Amino acid sequence: GELVMAAGLTPYSVEAMSCFMAGTKCEQTFLRKTEEEGFPETMCSYHRVFLGAALTGILPKPNCMIYTNLACDGNMMTFPYLKDKFECPGFYIDVPYEKNRESVLYVADQLRKLKRFLEETTDRRISEETVRSAVDNSRKAAANYKKQLALRCAHDPVTSLTNELYALFMCHLMAGSETAVTYTEKLLRDVRMSPRGDGLSVIWMHIMPFLQEPVKDIFNYSKKMHIRACDFIADGFQEMHAEDPYEAMAEKMVYCIYNGSVKQRVEEAERLARITEADGAVLFAHWGCKGTIGASSLIKQSLEKTGLPTMILDGDGCNPANTSDGQVSTRLQAFVEMLEKGKEEKQA
């Protein structure tokens, strides 16, 4: 995000664009188009909607594509395909599995090449001062996020799933922007001004199905159920320690919780639950996300061993046809009742 901001480009992502299109209720048209092209139904719905929109000509041809092997295996199918289809320049960032100094230096070198790629693509010079300024903005945003996180155990702003998703824009697409700094400053202010809620609180893991009615009914503007932190967002706002701006950006990618062993996702959820004093955790197992679905049972078992009640919520954040509202509602209500009972027993 920081280099894209330094280049003065306006980025959009597969997930963000597909969320928007699903919100307009036109996703089925694009899913059918993707199916006609031979893409498997087991592929992530965000990527299938995005591919379908691109194939129907709804999406404009981008100036370039930047992608990585982090978080989503769909990247490795979607972007090479569209790069050839659009005859569009693309840049791939390879992030090693190992988390060490060598990996950071390896990725930092790729990011320096990415800067040159963006200069050639835009025909515009990117100064080192602009790059450093973008990284400094990310440091400020991360510091603000850390401060508000520390307050969450005693402050519960009434919010919605959509509001939580705004933070994903700030720590990923808009990382390094002045807007991201302003967002975290206002978030910190809002949290400070909010009282402690009387209801339950959870840590949310992975993406949020903000369009699904039973999930909205439980969480949106609720005084009974609060999301105190999301691992996806907390990871995006992680602190960067390296002085060199390219190494700092590389550090954030190499040490991403979605890179490497699932153990890091468990440890991050434990850390967030401890800081925020959450009553439980919800892991959203999104359709087609093989990494999360495959690790979900291990994550649940590991967290419950520490005393954190955890629910695996199967569903689809982009294609409502893949999820039963009734089943989701029943499971969520049962989980809420279990948390309420557990809280009463602790207070007794």
Predicted regions mapped to residue ranges:
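Peripheral docking tails and interdomain loops at the edges
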Residues: S297-A348
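Redox- and metal-dependent alpha/beta enzyme cores, enriched for Fe-S-associated oxidoreductases
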Residues: L3-T29, I203-R274
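A charged, amphipathic alpha-helical module
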Residues: A108, R112, R116-E239, Y258
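Acidic/His-rich segments in extracytoplasmic proteins that coordinate ligands and/or metal ions
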Residues: R48-E120
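Glycine-rich, highly charged phosphate/nucleotide-binding loops
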Residues: E37-L55, I257-R271
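Metallocofactor- and cofactor-centric catalytic cores in central/energy metabolism, strongly enriched
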Residues: E2, P11, A22-K25, T29-E36, ...
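Gly/Ser/Thr-rich loops at beta-strand to alpha-helix junctions
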Residues: G1-E2, N69-N75, M205-Q212, W287-G294
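C-terminal hydrophobic structural anchor segments
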Residues: G260, V266-T306, M311
